[in-house]
Amino acid sequence: MNTLFGKTKEEAKPIVLKSVDEYPEAPISLGTTLVNPTGDWRTFKPVVNEEKCVKCYICWKYCPEPAIYIKPDGYVAIDYDYCKGCGICANECPTKAITMIKEEK
């Protein structure tokens, strides 16, 4: 099919966003962990290495839950009550400052 938003690849080129900052903020729907904390059912959890973090906030933008927040010093942190351990943040981090480690029970 090779379409985007009902347009062919060539027609869609002008609407493809080049920067993370160009993407719109998405609202949080009622089915998220905002109203349903995950608790501790994760298998893996993300851990931030501040020495590698460049404060680009890509992890924060891509996190599907309200689990990543920005601390007063500008670094990101994980609120494990809301993190479901999906690993999107670690996968999107350009400097690999976030690693997924086995959850200890």
UniProtKB/Swiss-Prot annotation:
**Enzyme kind, highest EC tier:** oxidoreductase
Q: What is the recorded name of this protein?
A: Ketoisovalerate oxidoreductase subunit VorD
> Which sites bind [4Fe-4S] cluster 1?
C53, C56, C59, C93
Annotated 4Fe-4S ferredoxin-type domain residues: 44-73, 74-103
**InterPro entries assigned:** 4Fe4S_Fe-S-bd, 4Fe4S_Fe_S_CS, PorD_KorD
UniProt keyword terms in alphabetical order: 4Fe-4S, Electron transport, Iron, Iron-sulfur, Metal-binding, Oxidoreductase, Repeat, Transport
Gene that codes for this? vorD
SUPFAM superfamilies xref list = 4Fe-4S ferredoxins
Q: Which PANTHER family match?
A: PYRUVATE SYNTHASE SUBUNIT PORD
Give me the segments passing through the membrane. Answer: none
Q: Which sites bind [4Fe-4S] cluster 2? A: C63, C83, C86, C89
